């Protein structure tokens, strides 16, 4: 009870000392400081072994404010991953703009590979997360949702609208590719991630073949013909069946 009263007092005292809202640039910067600190601890500690107090001390943020901004260590870790994903997507977008005429498939592969490049210095953190999801199903769901979010952005900016049920299936399919290739990436010590690139290309080809061989939705003749036209268009733009 005493600890909880002290935490409440810290929050109220810090709120009274500042007239800025929690969405102000200063608060955003402090949130990222906390996220960076949580991410740093994750390299050598499992999620269960990291306390918000440890994170606050590392970031140099008062405990009460850390509780108000972060809420939990898991939330801070996901915040850091969202920032890394945003960096990967925006840098890929810049590369795509400078690449000229390339297929949708090439753009998607470039986006996925660059995400692996961004996370390469943080394999220790990913290994800890892989352990944590075994006992934290909510974390597994949030990581899956976050992966699908970044995959959707990569697909859309590459030219695949990812709309409707078929679009959702493509998003989930590419997310599945990322998970499978991630196992290869964790062991890839080549300087240019050549092994990861090869596995990514192979898995994408396999996913494309499955996507064209499995007619998930049938419907009437008109719908099938429309679906065939759409599939042919996407296949061509993805670099499949381009004679």
Labelled PLM ranges:
Residues 4, 18, 187-243:
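C-terminal peripheral helix-coil segments that are non-catalytic and often amphipathic
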Residues 18, 33, 41-79, 83:
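Helix-turn-helix
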Residues 81-89, 137:
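Short, basic, alpha-helical segments at the C-terminal edge of helix-turn-helix-like DNA-binding modules
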Residues 97, 101, 156-163:
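Acidic/His metal-coordination segments adjacent to aromatic residues that form catalytic metal sites
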Residues 137-160, 168-179, 198:
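Amphipathic alpha-helical packing segments from all-alpha helical-bundle domains
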């Amino acid at each position: 009870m005493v600890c909880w009263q002290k935490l409440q007092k810290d929050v109220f005292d810090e709120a009274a000392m500042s007239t800025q809202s929690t969405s102000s640039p200063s608060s955003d910067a402090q949130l990222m400081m906390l996220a960076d600190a949580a991410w740093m601890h994750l390299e050598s500690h499992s999620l269960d072994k990291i306390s918000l107090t440890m994170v606050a001390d590392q970031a140099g943020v008062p405990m009460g404010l850390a509780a108000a901004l972060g809420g939990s260590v898991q939330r801070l870790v996901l915040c850091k991953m969202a920032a890394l994903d945003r960096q990967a997507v925006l840098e890929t977008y810049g590369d795509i703009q400078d690449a000229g005429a390339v297929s949708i498939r090439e753009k998607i592969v470039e986006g996925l590979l660059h995400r692996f490049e961004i996370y390469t210095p943080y394999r220790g953190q990913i290994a800890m997360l892989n352990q944590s999801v075994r006992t934290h199903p909510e974390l597994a769901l949030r990581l899956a949702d976050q992966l699908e979010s970044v995959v959707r952005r990569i697909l859309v900016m590459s030219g695949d609208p990812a709309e409707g049920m078929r679009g959702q299936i493509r998003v989930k399919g590419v997310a599945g590719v990322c998970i499978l290739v991630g196992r290869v990436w964790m062991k890839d010590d080549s300087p240019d991630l050549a092994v990861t690139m090869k596995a990514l290309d192979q898995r994408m080809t396999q996913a494309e073949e499955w996507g064209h061989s499995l007619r998930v939705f049938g419907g009437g003749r008109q719908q099938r013909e429309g679906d065939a036209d759409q599939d042919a268009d996407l296949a061509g733009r993805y670099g499949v069946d381009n004679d």
